[in-house]
From Swiss-Prot:
It comes from Shigella flexneri. It catalyses: oxaloacetate + phosphate = phosphoenolpyruvate + hydrogencarbonate. SUPFAM superfamilies: Phosphoenolpyruvate/pyruvate domain. This is Phosphoenolpyruvate carboxylase. Its EC number is 4.1.1.31.
């Protein structure tokens, strides 16, 4: 066993042992024995022992209803502990991320070694770094917040136990604390009883900021500064903070009727309240630290006679008073009280920055740089990264809601029906109104509740302090009028600045038309004047993959980006591409470094803006050290992509991708849309319907309550297939298309694409990862337990397809087995399979019992239902991504 993994294995086995003792104390020896038997059978089954595999199935089928929950919980909790150990391993000196902050050093050394790059060019690239991470409340974070806190503490214990020099009594204390934490987790219900509200989701986002990002961001900037000094002799300017955080929690109303204008207003206030709370703690530290007397004449002039004795403290105490007054006012507003704004209310970042920066400059000038560069510097950087709003909010709404609102308005005004007008007529009307000085909305108009909601949301944007709302994203954008309509509604609300409005192109057709839409918009003089040389466009990954399959979608995304980059470059517009990717492969997820380097050349010139979703937020930003690691990876990748962009693909490669795209899309849609057996098979072979019972996010799982696959959101669609281990959306169509191109004699060309074109090699790498997580015998077992025999041939057909796909991918990549070049991930999947397999078998059994009871008109047994929910959460932990 590789040395690197032995530390991980020993931690996993130690945590497993403690969990075993906890189970024994709580439920007795016999349950622990039952769990141990199942674990050993699973291990042996994985090693290829068919007799033990059969015994595993029989044992799990024969569990009594009383045994179901303890067994499901044992394996589910074990997987959470294994994930925690793995997370620690990724930041421990013995593990992976001994190397991650090194990413920056490695990248800088690589760039310095390129003869065509001067140090000045590299510095300029660093200065133009821009990374905006958009936290979204996707319902994929299955783990309850209370358990996440316990796992963070388990992580801290593992860190201290790694210290060889601790005394025996300290080691014993730490082991006792670990036992307490694992016992607390065991006796906590891991399934939420109620769906979180949008405000709960926003609070979850603030908790990530407080527990991890608040410390992680300044630490990352220190690391970046150190590497730049060492490699380029260059110091980061104090005001330079290339990373920002935005949130969709409380702002994303697309398909979520629970997010209203009032909710957004509340979340904006709550976010500002949390910012004052966190900055107050920082300022309190600075009040006690900055006791120095010597100051520059400028600082002494600023504080006057009153503050001359302790000028720095004087300024900090003043700032503290303003923060306290601001917090009290926000608290009253949150309780619904209407109060006049107090004097000194903090609404802009400059008001926080100026007194802090004045102290910084004075300390530097008086030879106290070592003090200036301590906590004060960290706070200054937090002002730049988080500031008064803490996290900015994006507003997202579906395009048809704006069209319907304008339709209702034009009908009321008696000037026709906007909804039925041609695109040219819509544009003419919108541009006329955008240029007009008179208001369009009549004062006494009483619109419908839906339209009122759209108008109220625009009102909230107009009232919010400038800078607290980052962008207005239009989902399902199809035409230039979709973008102009939002600008008109914002103008009518009285917004006094050019709010960034980003169309989101998310189906195959919309991606293919994206460049035409943006070209038309950029040809409108009024629009060019408004945007002042900057444009944001969002690329949807999940809906396009659900619409056309992963191969066709990824090529459409690439081509749309490529065309938009060239169009904007020609027009002299700085384009920011906003990537709406999920954590799972079927929703565009890929390891960050590979994903960024596989984008078209020039795609990161306007910075990187990307969604971080659900459980990925915890995996990538759950601890300050992991935050440093993740931000370092992004930084290295952006620098490399901008300074050493991937080559333009050859024309012949583009033609092959066009071909792969058509073949794979036809096959994918042939099954998903046209095969009459597909939807009944999907509904019975996966826990799709049961997933709806999980109180995950505040957003309904379907856009429309009735309807087939097309009405399902992308997340439950992926989630369901991940549960039964067929992982279908992440590969269906791709391998068949590759096979067809190989049969046409183009294998050597595909191999060259794999070697020399990051876009293509990343695609294949992602397919390999999906195949490594998929499991055909388990998928077959779900069929046998749950699916009508008439549909078995379809299941067999799909499994055969996957087997063929694996062969062709390995042949093109020249690999003997899956994940050959990422042994760390392969090891991690193997480690978890032993614990995930029993949960899969058990889930199929539970679905069988639950559906059987329903068929017989009985109420489902609550023990079965609860155990089922636990298996869903456990498998999600085992797969390390849900949707």
């Amino acid at each position: 066993m590789n040395e690197q993994y032995s530390a991980l294995r020993s931690n996993v086995s130690m945590l497993g042992k403690v969990l075993g003792e906890t189970i024994k104390d709580a439920l007795g020896e016999h349950i622990l024995e039952r769990v141990e038997t199942i674990r050993k059978l699973s291990k042996s089954s994985r090693a290829g022992n068919d007799a033990n595999r059969q015994e595993l199935l029989t044992t799990l089928q024969n569990l009594s209803n009383d045994e179901l929950l303890p067994v499901a919980r044992a394996f589910s909790q074990f997987l959470n502990l294994a994930n925690t150990a793995e997370q620690y391993h990724s930041i421990s000196p013995k593990g992976e991320a001994a190397s991650n902050p090194e990413v920056i050093a490695r990248t800088l050394r690589k760039l310095k070694n390129q003869p065509e790059l001067s140090e000045d060019t590299i510095k300029k690239a660093v200065e133009s770094l821009s990374l905006e991470l958009v936290l979204t409340a996707h319902p994929t974070e299955i783990t309850r917040r209370t358990l996440i806190h316990k796992m963070v503490e388990v992580n801290a214990c593992l860190k201290q136990l790694d210290n060889k020099d601790i005394a025996d009594y300290e080691r014993n204390q730490l082991m006792r604390r670990l036992r307490q934490l694992i016992a607390q987790s065991w006796h906590t219900d891991e399934i939420r009883k109620l769906r979180p509200s949008p405000v709960d989701e926003a609070k979850w986002g603030f908790a990530v900021v407080e527990n991890s990002l608040w410390q992680g961001v300044p630490n990352y900037l220190r690391e970046l500064n150190e590497q730049l000094e060492e490699n380029l002799g260059y110091k980061l300017p104090v005001e330079f903070v290339p990373v920002r955080f935005t949130s969709w929690m409380g702002g994303d109303r697309d398909g979520n009727p629970n997010v209203t204008a009032d909710i957004t207003r509340h979340v904006l206030l709550l976010s500002r309240w949390k910012a004052t709370d966190l900055f107050l703690k920082d300022i309190q530290v600075l009040v006690s630290e900055l006791s120095m007397v010597e100051a520059t004449p400028e600082l002494l002039a600023l504080v006057g006679e009153e503050g001359a004795a302790e000028p720095y403290r004087y300024l900090m105490k003043n700032l503290r008073s303003r923060l306290m007054a601001t917090q009290a006012w926000l608290e009253a507003r949150l309780k619904g009280e209407e109060l006049p704004k107090p004097e000194g209310l903090l609404t802009q970042n400059e008001e926080l920055w100026e007194p802090l920066y004045a102290c910084y400059q004075s300390l530097q000038a008086c030879g106290m740089g070592i003090i200036a560069n301590g906590d004060l510097l960290d706070t200054l950087r937090r002002v730049k990264c988080f500031g008064v709003p803490l996290v900015r909010i994006d507003i997202r709404q579906e395009s048809t809601r704006h069209t319907e609102a304008l339709g209702e308005l034009t009908r009321y005004l008696g000037i026709g029906d906007y909804e039925s007008w041609s695109e040219a007529d819509k544009q003419a009307f919108l541009i006329r109104e955008l240029n007009s000085k008179r208001p369009l909305l009549p004062r006494n108009w009483q619109p419908s509740a839906e339209t009122r909601e759209v108008l109220d949301t625009c009102q909230v944007i107009a009232e919010a302090p400038q800078g607290s709302i980052a962008a207005y994203v239009i989902s399902m954008a199809k035409t230039p009028s979709d973008v102009l309509a939002v600008h008109l509604l914002l103008k009518e609300a009285g917004i006094g600045f050019a709010m960034p409005v980003a169309p989101l192109f998310e189906t195959l057709d919309d991606l293919n038309n994206a460049n035409d839409v943006m070209t038309q918009l950029l040809n409108i003089d009024w629009y060019r004047g408004l945007i002042q040389g900057k444009q944001m466009v969002m690329i949807g990954y999940s809906d396009s993959a659900k619409d056309a399959g992963v191969m066709a979608a990824s090529w459409a995304q690439y081509q749309a980006q490529d065309a938009l980059i060239k169009t904007c470059e020609k027009a002299g517009i700085e384009l920011t591409l906003f990537h709406g990717r999920g954590g799972s492969i079927g929703r565009g997820g890929a390891p960050a470094h590979a994903a960024l380097l596989s984008q078209p050349p020039g795609s990161l010139k306007g910075g990187l803006r990307v969604t971080e979703q659900g459980e990925m937020i915890r995996f990538k930003y759950g601890l300050p050290e992991i935050t440093v690691s993740s931000l370092s990876l992004y930084t290295g990748a952006i620098l490399e992509a901008n300074l050493l962009p991937p080559p333009e693909p050859k024309e012949s490669w583009r033609r092959i991708m066009d071909e792969l795209s058509v073949i794979s899309c036809d096959l994918y849609r042939g099954y998903v849309r046209e095969n009459k057996d597909f939807v009944p098979y999907f509904r019975s072979a996966t826990p799709e319907q049961e997933l709806g019972k999980l109180p995950l996010g505040s957003r309904p799982a379907k856009r429309r309550p009735t309807g087939g696959v097309e009405s399902l959101r992308a997340i439950p669609w992926i989630f369901a297939w991940t549960q039964n281990r067929l992982m279908l959306p992440a590969w269906l169509g791709a391998g068949t298309a590759l096979q067809k191109v190989v049969e046409d004699g183009k294998q050597s060309e595909l191999e060259a694409m794999c070697r020399d074109w990051p876009f293509f090699s990343t695609r294949l790498g992602m397919l390999e990862m999906v195949f490594a997580k998929a499991d055909l015998w388990l998928a077959e077992y779900y069929d046998q337990r749950l699916v009508d025999k008439a549909l078995w041939p379809l299941g067999k057909e799909l499994r055969n397809l996957q087997e063929e796909d694996i062969k062709v991918v390995l042949a093109i990549a020249n690999d003997s087995h899956l994940m050959a070049d990422l042994p760390w991930i392969a090891e991690s999947i193997q480690l978890r399979n032993i614990y995930t397999d029993p949960l899969n078998v058990l889930q199929a059994e539970l679905l069988h019992r639950s559906r059987q009871a329903e068929k017989e008109g009985q109420e489902p047994d609550p023990r079965v239902e609860q155990a089922l929910m636990v298996t869903i959460a456990g498998i999600a932990a085992g797969m390390r991504n849900t949707g």
